[in-house]
A protein has these predicted regions:
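Active-site PLP-lysine loop of aminotransferase-like
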Residues: 21, 63-64, 103, 181
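Flexible, small-/acidic-enriched active-site or ligand-binding loops
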Residues: 3, 51-80
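A short core secondary-structure module
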Residues: 18-57
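Beta-sandwich/jelly-roll carbohydrate-recognition scaffolds of carbohydrate-active enzymes
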Residues: 5-7
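Short beta-strand-to-turn element immediately C-terminal to the catalytic PLP-Schiff-base lysine
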Residues: 9, 35-38, 47-49, 73-75, ...
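Alpha-helical interface subdomain recognition
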Residues: 1, 10-15, 73, 97-246
Length: 246
């Protein structure tokens, strides 16, 4: 949160929002933007209409992403007090709950991606023969498929468990959702890579399903919390629970 430079200033007529947000999901197609801004000594959330005066939306550089991204610039955007979500300066707990939900959703997407990639690889390796036997019956290929299934099912179970826990305590589940997101997205990279390898040159065809999965798997380790950042938080929680508590 310390890196947020968007600010909200209270005036006699309401609020003035200034700053910018980069790589915002669905920028340009959304009707409203939920915006986090520094207000006083804390942080607040605001619901900003897309057509409000002073708000400029422009596309981000083209990147590998599952949805449209863009930049929002708030140039002295005037808002009523009623646009604030919750109490002034009390957005932190809402942010934690939102991050928890988003990270679980990314973990779920990674599980679905693994499922699709593995099904594609199994179909190919069962139908294509080499030296008189299906590829799936050759030891090296069978190992790729088996390890991928192991990654898929362990990620699926952790994601389901985390979602069930979040339903009861969304605000206190961030570390667990971070663990699910880290586990599933890292596994997705391994699984899709193995699937490409098992399919040989057929896994390298541009425009194929497996090529699409390969492209989609990589950014999952970056958005909604990069893997390296998640590891720091997870390790900190682990030390508190199992270490000396500091």
């Amino acid at each position: 949160l310390k890196g947020i430079n968007t600010k909200a200033e209270v005036t006699k007529d309401g609020l003035i929002l200034t700053g910018a947000k980069s790589f915002i999901s669905n920028a340009g197609s959304a009707s409203f933007y939920t915006t986090l801004a520094k207000e006083g000594d804390g942080y607040s959330l605001f619901l900003v209409p897309a057509d409000v005066d002073g708000l400029t939306v422009s596309p981000s550089p083209e990147i590998i992403a599952p949805h449209v991204l863009g930049e929002l610039v708030f140039d002295n955007v005037a808002l009523p007090e009623s646009s604030r979500l919750g109490e002034p300066g009390a957005a932190f707990r809402h942010v934690l709950a939102t991050l928890s939900v988003f990270r679980i959703s990314v973990a779920g997407a990674a599980v679905g991606l693994m499922q699709g990639a593995l099904e594609e690889a199994v179909r190919h390796c069962s139908a294509r023969e080499q030296f008189g036997r299906p590829l799936a019956k050759h030891g090296p290929v069978a190992t790729l498929l088996a390890d991928s299934w192991s990654d898929l099912e362990s990620s699926r179970l952790l994601t389901y468990q985390t979602a069930a826990m979040a339903a009861n305590d969304p605000e206190g589940n961030l570390d667990r959702s971070s663990l699910a997101k880290l586990t599933a997205t890292e596994a997705a990279t391994r699984v899709v890579d193995r699937c490409v390898q098992s399919m040989g040159r057929w896994g390298l065809i541009r425009g194929s399903k497996i090529e699409k999965y390969y492209r989609q798997a990589r950014p999952m380790r970056v958005y909604e919390g990069a893997s390296e950042v998640l590891r720091l938080g997870i390790a900190s929680r682990l030390v508190k629970e199992l270490g000396d508590g500091s």
